[in-house]
């Protein structure tokens, strides 16, 4: 349970990343992003391979491993490749333009989708019962985090964000957004 809480604390660090991002404090922004990321990866690793587990058939485990890797790639793609990396995560200037194409045409927070699927498939691969609980708790915290981003940060960071909210679902893609995603993905 300690690692579940440690993983939860990483979301506080991610929130502080946004606070210092909007204040233009690049050193603190990067520091809290790295602390949050390292804390989260460490917690996830420990939970995935510790404690009791359920046995799943080898075929389920293999398919789940593949789907986990796809989800992990999509998470990395959405957060670190589609967004301009240096401007988003490194520079002082936070207003780097709103991305509305690719996976960001699918929904406003595609990382939350990939995050959820990543933990579901990792559970079916490892069988870790604690991982299932942690994944659900952390996904709930991720949803709270993106809600807070929308409420307190993104309106100020991106001038067209209100328009984007009207045209793109927050978390659950619809048929129109799925078509727009495939049409604009690079």
Name each region found by the language model.
Residues 100-101, 105-113:
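Histidine-centered phosphotransfer motif of kinases
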Residues 1-100, 118-186:
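Membrane-anchoring alpha-helices and their flanking helix-loop junctions
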């Amino acid at each position: 349970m300690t690692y579940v809480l440690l993983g939860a604390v990483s979301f506080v660090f991610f929130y502080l990343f946004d606070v210092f991002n909007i204040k233009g404090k690049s050193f603190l922004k990067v520091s809290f992003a790295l602390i949050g990321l390292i804390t989260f990866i460490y917690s996830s690793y420990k939970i995935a391979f510790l404690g009791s587990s359920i046995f799943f058939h080898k075929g389920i485990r293999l398919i789940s491993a593949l789907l986990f890797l796809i989800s992990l790639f999509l998470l990395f793609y959405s957060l670190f490749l589609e967004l301009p990396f240096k401007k988003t995560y490194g520079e002082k200037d936070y207003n780097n333009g709103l991305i509305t194409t690719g996976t960001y045409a699918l929904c406003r927070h595609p990382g939350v989708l990939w995050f959820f699927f990543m933990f579901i498939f990792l559970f079916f691969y490892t069988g870790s019962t604690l991982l299932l609980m942690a994944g659900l708790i952390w996904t709930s915290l991720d949803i709270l985090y993106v809600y807070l981003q929308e409420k307190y940060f993104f309106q100020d960071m991106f001038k067209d964000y209100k328009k984007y909210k009207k045209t793109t679902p927050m978390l659950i893609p619809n048929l129109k957004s799925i078509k727009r995603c495939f049409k604009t993905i690079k």
